[in-house]
Amino acid sequence: MNKIKIFLIAVILAAGAGRLPVFAEAKYSLKEMTPAVEAALEGRRERFDELTAFKDKGAIGENNRGYVEVLAPDSGAKALADAENKDRAVIYKTIAEQNGLTAELETIEKVFAQVQHDKAKPGAKIQNDDGQWVTK
């Protein structure tokens, strides 16, 4: 049951980036939309296009732990990745706390990583489960 709950949480996180249909958001929600989560979701929306551009260039990829990683030195990539990862961490931690899943934070991160990998465009850099970076 927890794996289903965690998967649905990941769907909500992806929806928060504004790229999933509304019906996906209705399956599961945060118990309380905290100011920190609202700010994190807004930050993710604001940097989405810039992050996508860095991913398209291969400068940033999606790792296997639910975060982005700088793969090639590029002006601004590190600051952008750091901001994105900070916001993701806020969201993951809040969802885990509100749903009594703090012991499963790493699982939430990995499920979200899989969602991000599934959503990645062809040509995007993703890290597989054994740590190798591959092109989708």
Question: Where do the model's predicted regions map?
Answer:
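Amphipathic, charged alpha-helical segments and their helix-to-coil junctions
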Residues: 24-86, 98-136
